[in-house]
Amino acid sequence: MDEFHRCGKEDSFWQQCFLYPLFFQEDLYAISHDHYLDVSSSSRPMEHLSSNDQLSFLTVKRLIGQIRQQNHSIVLFVNCDPNPLADRKKSFYSESVLEALTLVLEVPFSIWSKYSVEGMNECKSFRSIHSIFPFLEDKFPHSNSILDARIPYSIHPEILVRTFRRWIRDAPSLHPLRSVLYDYRNSPENLQRSIIVVPRVNTRFFLFLLNYYVCECESILFSRLKRSSHSRPLSHGSFPQRTHFHRKIKHIIIFSRRNSLKSIWSLKDPKIHYVRYGERPIIAIKGAHLLVKKCRYYLLIFRQFYFHLWSEPYRVCSHQLSKNCSSSPGYFLRVRMNPIFVRTKMLDELFIADLITNEMDPIVPIVPIIGLLATEKFCDISGRPISKLSWTSLTDDDILDRFDQIWRNLFHYYSGSFDRDGLYRIKYILSLSCAKTLACKHKSTIRVVRKELGPELFKKSFSKEREFDSLPFSSKAAARSQRERIWHSDIPQINPLANSWQKIQDLKIENLFDQ
């Protein structure tokens, strides 16, 4: 690996590196063996772990030889093929080889990512999802439309292998990758598909494939956008999985006007901003409706011709920022632009200028949230709280914890709004629904539940707001806090409520395009 790092700066390194000899390093399989035992021991009882789980390096080499001798040229256009690896897909040695394959492929990929980031001195990274809110406040006031483009996670295995061949010419090292991809493609759930559906499982191999696939898409897409956005900076942010990045590209690429007019995608005075959380990118655009349609068409054509993948039109939808809600990340976000007039006066009143800027004012979309709460059986369609009957079998602490988790995430996300009336209404619905759920469980009334539990009823639940409001502000800071927003972000992951809303929105869009 040290040799890879020494050669990483050479331009020809990506075309000459050889990874196949690494498959026969015993230390590599010792690492993968220990990792496999750590994962399996957490999911299997101790009596199932025996001395048979000892690794034999000779067996590993024989398995690699069988993988290399497989011929996948006959399964490019068929749905199923007898694969010797499929029978022992879940066996001990196949899992060890899969772990080793991931380690080998991560070596050049990590070096490539390191030097690509080091070469961009103008980029700054923040490893936190909290940076998404400064991005929204900084970029959204200068935009009027949003493209919500979902990254397709279904792709033919041969396309993935060929994308690796662009920067790895060591063909033998890609034979195990091709074998594993076709193995999962020929699994029972994918027999009727011509493309591989990457399982949504938290394995290191598939997370690596997903991150590589997203990186490949974005690296090529950004180069195209830079060319089309002549003499304009391109800002983008990336938040893959739990490792979140936010980058602001400050340099300006200048093209001649003659060359810009020749290009199909030479956009006049464009402002394009890109942010992604998980598999849901958001592109904020300032421009006419024709520009938004061109960008949407470009994304669809880019996926179709570069990855040979038909992308459904509903996976890239556009809407105006001032009229529609957007999801970022997974929650509702409705923005109202408030114009701010600033007058500047020069010395001796020789010059006076009026500047007009926009300020982002997030709004709590109370109607869509009530509709979502009604779908999840917390209230009816008019917003009247009801008991959550499916939770009556839980303990009192579990019920309070679940309501507390939903309220905490909603409050942290929408606490930056000036107008909190809608937020307090949501709190009322959740608190009364929690009380009705406890009353239904104990077969009593809300008054009896409050009388028996007393102040302990909501002492634990809905306490996050009190912690937030009781922060030690000074008198001047407290007065300023009434005028300014304070983002209090604590969203390590999207809760089931937001995921449920996202599924409803996706289903509505799919039904709209099916009609």
From Swiss-Prot:
GO biological process, one term: RNA splicing
Main location: plastid
Domain of life the protein comes from: Eukaryota
Protein keywords: Chloroplast, mRNA processing, Plastid, RNA-binding, tRNA processing
Entries under InterPro entries matching the protein: Domain_X, Maturase_MatK, Maturase_MatK_N
Any matching Pfam family: MatK_N
Function: Usually encoded in the trnK tRNA gene intron. Probably assists in splicing its own and other chloroplast group II introns.
Protein name per its UniProtKB record: Maturase K
